[in-house]
């Protein structure tokens, strides 16, 4: 399973705040921390271990920025860091999680001649049986791709989304749905969340070769945590590559359709 969480936290020098994060084996987390504008040019880093006023355990750096390395991705193994200086936030992406990654981490800003500002992140990585870790889909150009992703019941009330990955950014393009049994559309992507069934349905219509990519199904809590649950690999082929005409893919209704009907009840066949 995949996960990826987003945390928005204000770090104050000399003050330790703590959050708990659940990740899924095979997934990842995105941790987003805010900082005071006066620390825009300071080094940002992410480390594993305890960090208290009286350090009894070393916090080993996993990834860090250089000064003036703002608005650029920094990559190191399974980690990526991006410092959005205009918004005074930086994000840490932690991919390909395993249960061995469970532990204590720190999201921090390096402050010279003073206590660094940091937030303790307690990460617990588990394996969930409800959902697939990865699925592969294919469609002919001009057709539609239907995505179905299950999620843990504990996330039923959360916002659901499908993100398209671009390089280090697991969520370069996002379409989300905030209500149960209502379609939400953005561009060629439409989403439908059935919270009773814990099932997220997505439809990408009129696909082209440009839609061949890695996508992620996930959830976002009201605290801003983003959890990437299932990786979806989509391959779009030319019509000439298919051995026989494929059946027409169903399409979703507009987002204004009634919320009482299921996705399949509201789909119509494209001509």
Predicted regions and their residues:
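Extracellular mucin-like PTS segments
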Residues: 237-271
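Extracellular/luminal immunoglobulin-like beta-sandwich modules
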Residues: 98-100, 104-127, 167, 208-210, ...
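Solvent-exposed loop/turn motifs of extracellular immunoglobulin-like beta-sandwich domains
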Residues: 3, 23-30, 39-41, 85-89, ...
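Extended, solvent-exposed segments with strong compositional bias
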Residues: 80-84, 189-194
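Short, structured motif recognition centered on aromatic/hydrophobic residues
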Residues: 46, 76-79, 90-94, 147, ...
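Amphipathic alpha-helical interaction motifs in eukaryotic regulatory proteins
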Residues: 34, 47, 95-98, 108, ...
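N-terminal V-set
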Residues: 37-76, 154-186
